[in-house]
Amino acid sequence: MAKEATRIRRRERKNIVSGVAHVNASFNNTMITITDAQGNTISWSSAGAMGFKGSRKSTPYAAQVAAEDAGRKAAEHGMRTLEVEVSGPGSGRESALRALQAAGFTVTSIRDVTPIPHNGCRPRKRRRV
């Protein structure tokens, strides 16, 4: 039995002009997902996916590189305007936003959607360094 030649599926070019950039900046990593208005993912990137490991993933520079990568992929699909939703306490929040603006996107709105508990679960214990 001969193996069938695996067909490489070419990613079709969607023509989406505006979308939403979700920036999730945790203490350990920064993830950027660019979606259309319905929430379907167009492109994504993270500091870890860009080759940063360990504590370097949480740096603002790593977030900037990841945002540039996600923006470049989204621009290939014709995206030009973005709404930005920033979530999390990490250090890559502002640098990812600046990188998206520098990549040529028109940022129409910036929203902070960090979940804040109204005295919900007990937080983890304090670090003593």
UniProtKB/Swiss-Prot annotation:
What InterPro entries does the record tag this protein with?
A: Ribosomal_uS11, Ribosomal_uS11_bac-type, Ribosomal_uS11_CS, Ribosomal_uS11_sf
Superkingdom of origin organism:
Bacteria
Is Nuclease found in the keyword set?
no
Coiled-coil regions listed in the entry:
none
What keywords are annotated for this sequence in UniProt? Answer: Ribonucleoprotein, Ribosomal protein, RNA-binding, rRNA-binding
Q: Which GO molecular function terms does the record list?
A: rRNA binding; structural constituent of ribosome
Task: Cite the PROSITE patterns for this sequence.
Answer: RIBOSOMAL_S11
Outline what the protein does: Located on the platform of the 30S subunit, it bridges several disparate RNA helices of the 16S rRNA. Forms part of the Shine-Dalgarno cleft in the 70S ribosome.
NCBIfam families of this UniProt entry?
PRK05309.1, uS11_bact
Q: Which HAMAP family match?
A: Ribosomal_uS11 (MF_01310)
Q: What is this protein called?
A: Small ribosomal subunit protein uS11
Q: Which organism is it from?
A: Methylobacterium sp. (strain 4-46)
